[in-house]
């Protein structure tokens, strides 16, 4: 999956990062690492040209992605509300605070149903800010895409792993045998 939105001053790319699975000692498939939805923001360097070498990346967890998708739903009043996510990849370690990222969504003030996505990153004192307006149609497409991807990043629709998980768990009535 690769969905992109291109505007005059910035671009947004949406990508699926699948979860990874492994087989435990009893032959059950378990999720090793949850997937996510990767948002990549690039500033413009000219007409229809974007500097992807200076891109900012923000990986939405399944819970963050679900919240964002629900806030994107134009039939709900929640689109008028702001939503903001903050990540510090070094949190709890010696590099805490050296890289921080935030993603903020807020409704366009003109009431058209569009939103602004604002990405901010501070990396060793250097700042990157990329703002992208997302039209009503793009909001609708983004909402549908994210809602479709959330179960997949949680591992529910990976056919190989689910087949393996379901077949290994059928011999046991314990729901914990699914490994999720």
Summary of predicted features, one role per range:
Residues 43-58, 123-134:
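A cross-kingdom feature marking solvent-exposed beta-strand/loop segments within repeated
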Residues 1-24, 47:
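Short N-terminal edge-element motif at the start of the domain
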Residues 45-49, 56-78:
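Compact, well-ordered interaction domains used in eukaryotic information-processing assemblies
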Residues 74-94, 154-171:
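Short glycine-rich, low-complexity/disordered patches
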Residues 120-180:
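Mixed-charge, glycine-accented linear interaction segment located at domain edges/termini
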Residues 28-33, 58-59, 107-109, 131-138:
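Short, low-complexity cationic-aromatic patches
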Residues 37, 80-117:
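Intrinsic, low-complexity N-terminal interaction/targeting segments
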Residues 26-48, 114-118:
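A short, structured beta-strand/loop element
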